[in-house]
């Protein structure tokens, strides 16, 4: 319809958000050109943006359309997590390890898993796996077996959702003392939550911070 419209465009954390207007007139074709201002170049300083918690299914490793989505957000490393429960897994990935990575123009998508995940012990995340590892139903609460297998494969493992949602603090208390946990996802949904991270640091445990969107489930309003 004829009128004045507001245009808003963004591209990740290194570009300023563009805001402008465009007038649409009757009987005319209106073209608009947007130019995003980059205010910092973190890769040139050795820092690369990433999202450790995405749920997106792909049928093939080199999924150009999916790669385009995350590249538009300027996410250099996107970890696509196969999501499990006691019965099955969802968002299954086509390949694992090096074969499960698709790198183009400095932006990569890779396979990982969020499994095991329960409301009794929290949700766990495992990156850089050579193959997925899903516990049988009668051992599903034995989280330590997945952490140990992840490390045997050269993986990196931790707890999602601030280490608090879905009773993740219970899992942290059980697994951190045995040096099984590499990180806690403390930044999500626009919130930084550290109350289940600092106590372990104060006790002398090495526990890295992580950030993940949990797309498409979490958002700034949650």
Language model segments and positions:
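Extracellular beta-sheet/turn segments enriched in Thr/Pro/Gly and aliphatic residues
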Residues: 22-42
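Solvent-exposed coil/turn segments that connect beta secondary-structure elements
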Residues: 12-14, 39
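Surface-exposed coil/turn segments at beta-strand junctions on protein surfaces, enriched
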Residues: 1-2, 25
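Edge beta-strands of extracellular beta-sandwich domains
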Residues: 16-23, 209
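Short acidic/polar mixed-charge low-complexity motifs
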Residues: 14-16, 28, 205
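Catalytic cores of extracellular degradative/oxidative enzymes
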Residues: 45-220
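A short, solvent-exposed beta-strand micro-motif common in secreted/extracellular proteins
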Residues: 2-12, 70
């Amino acid at each position: 319809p004829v009128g004045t419209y507001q245009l808003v465009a963004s591209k990740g954390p290194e570009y300023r958000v563009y805001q402008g207007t465009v007038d649409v007139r009757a009987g005319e074709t209106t073209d608009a050109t947007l130019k995003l201002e980059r205010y910092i170049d973190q890769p040139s300083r050795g820092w690369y943006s990433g999202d450790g918690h995405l749920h997106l299914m792909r049928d093939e490793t080199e999924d150009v359309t999916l790669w385009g989505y995350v590249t538009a957000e300027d996410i250099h490393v996107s970890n696509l997590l196969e999501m499990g429960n006691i019965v099955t897994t969802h968002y299954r990935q086509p390949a694992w390890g090096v074969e499960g990575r698709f790198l183009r123009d400095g932006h990569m998508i890779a396979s990982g898993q969020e499994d095991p995940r329960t409301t009794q012990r929290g949700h766990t995340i495992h990156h850089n796996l050579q193959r997925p590892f899903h516990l049988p139903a009668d051992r599903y609460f034995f989280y330590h077996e997945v952490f140990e297998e992840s490390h045997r494969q050269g993986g990196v493992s931790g707890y999602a959702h601030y280490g608090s949602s879905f009773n993740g603090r219970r899992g942290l208390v059980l697994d951190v003392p045995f040096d099984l946990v590499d990180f806690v996802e403390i930044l999500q949904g626009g919130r930084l939550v550290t109350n289940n991270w600092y106590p372990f640091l104060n006790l002398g445990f090495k526990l890295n911070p992580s950030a993940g969107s949990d797309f498409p489930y979490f958002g700034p309003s949650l």
